[in-house]
């Protein structure tokens, strides 16, 4: 039968690390393959590198177990723990973002419910760095309306100005 996506991830990473194609950066590149493969299959790009590096010695031992003895068990167990840990981290971040947006929306409560000012906070989650033009296009409003909305958020301390040139 076909291999599960988890098995494909485990094999791809272990093979990449075994081949070690570059002089430098193989570990980073190999860990970057994991979220890219997930995304290619339509899944969210879990950031597994952090969890793997927090268990650095176990990570190296598990890969060596595959490379030197063909023993996949330790690597599969470690990778599965990293997936669970990464999912937990992603859920916590998503909850924190929801809480942040709700707080911003409360702070902006004096503005009309469907105004550009009230809609910007949710848009910021997917676009944390943006120009007035990007805000206007994303919110479906004029550039002056987007500029006014961003100025309201600037006054509320929700956004900050990166540079005058980028703002206008």
Each model region followed by its residue ranges:
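Phosphate/pyrophosphate-binding active-site loops
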Residues: 1-95
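Short alpha-helical segments that sit at the start of domains
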Residues: 90-121
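Short acidic, hydrophobic short linear motifs in intrinsically disordered regions
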Residues: 121, 126-139
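Basic amphipathic alpha-helical segments that dock to polyanions
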Residues: 124, 146-156
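A short, conserved structural fragment
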Residues: 154-164
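Minor-groove-contacting beta-hairpin "wing" of winged helix-turn-helix DNA-binding domains
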Residues: 166-168
């Amino acid at each position: 039968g076909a291999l599960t996506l988890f098995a494909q991830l485990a094999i791809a990473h272990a093979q990449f690390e075994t081949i070690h194609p570059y002089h430098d950066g193989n570990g980073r590149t190999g860990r970057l393959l994991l979220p890219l493969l997930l995304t290619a299959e339509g899944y969210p790009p879990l950031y597994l590198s952090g969890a793997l590096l927090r268990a650095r010695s176990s990570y190296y031992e598990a890969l060596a177990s595959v490379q030197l003895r063909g023993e996949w068990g330790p690597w599969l167990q470690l990778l599965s723990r990293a997936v669970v840990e990464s999912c937990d981290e992603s859920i916590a971040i998503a909850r924190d973002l929801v809480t942040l947006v709700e707080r911003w929306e409360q702070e902006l409560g004096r503005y009309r419910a469907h105004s550009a000012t009230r809609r910007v906070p949710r848009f910021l989650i997917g676009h944390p760095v943006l120009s007035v033009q990007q805000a206007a296009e994303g919110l479906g409003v004029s550039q002056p309306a987007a500029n006014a909305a961003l100025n309201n958020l600037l006054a509320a301390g929700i956004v900050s100005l990166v540079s005058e040139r980028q703002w206008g």
